[in-house]
Design a protein with these regions (language model features):
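Donor-sugar nucleotide-binding helix/loop cap in glycosyltransferases
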Residues: 1-193
Length: 193
């Protein structure tokens, strides 16, 4: 809410360095952190909003459903809005200063539609792929298995453990997706198991 209000107060202008520092302070006033440098936590929180698609790079705008998400009267509606926002706008390579047009969640779900299920190793493989290099918007099973094998060789999971866990957590929160026996499925497909 603080970030969205800040965007409104700045009339949807790109955030300046001093404004960004003030925004971090506002966040820490509401949600204090006891870390050595609490502003790191505030910056991570802001970047998470950008990566999930709630807020745009430069903190000059937000997703059309972000305020509705904050006002959602029920958890079910909030979960629905989360899925819509993340599905439409999530970009895990974006941050406050750098825009990145790739739509990772859309790429993952499009691949899942064609493969049926994704194990953690395959999800890790997908994390190493640039969706922009695949104009079809998905990859087939052979490409995915090759990417997974290469990620395994490069110790991607060990180096990116937190990011892998974060992505799996986000995917599990999306409407119509679920993990069953450590594999990602569409809910409808998982119910048939």
């Amino acid at each position: 809410k603080i970030v969205l209000n800040d965007i409104d107060e700045r009339n949807f202008e790109q955030i300046e360095k001093d404004e960004y520092s003030n925004l971090q302070k506002k966040i820490l006033e509401v949600n204090p952190k006891s870390a050595k440098d609490p502003t790191v936590s505030a910056r991570k929180s802001i970047n998470q909003l950008v990566k999930l698609g709630f807020v745009k790079t430069g903190l000059r705008n937000y997703h059309r459903l972000s305020k509705e998400y904050l006002r959602a009267p029920t958890s079910a509606y909030r979960n629905k809005l989360f899925s819509l926002i993340v599905g439409e706008a999530a970009n895990f390579a974006a941050n406050v200063t750098n825009h990145d047009g790739r739509r990772h969640v859309d790429f993952i779900t499009s691949t899942l539609m064609r493969i049926g299920s994704l194990n953690k190793k395959q999800i890790i493989g997908l994390m190493t792929i640039d969706p922009e290099n695949h104009p079809k918007g998905f990859i087939d099973l052979d490409e995915l298995n090759l990417a997974s094998k290469n990620a395994s060789k490069n110790s991607f999971f060990e180096r990116k453990y937190n990011q892998v866990s974060y992505l799996c957590n986000v995917l599990n929160k999306l409407e119509d997706l679920t993990f069953h026996d450590s594999k990602l499925f569409f809910d409808e497909d998982a119910r048939r198991l």
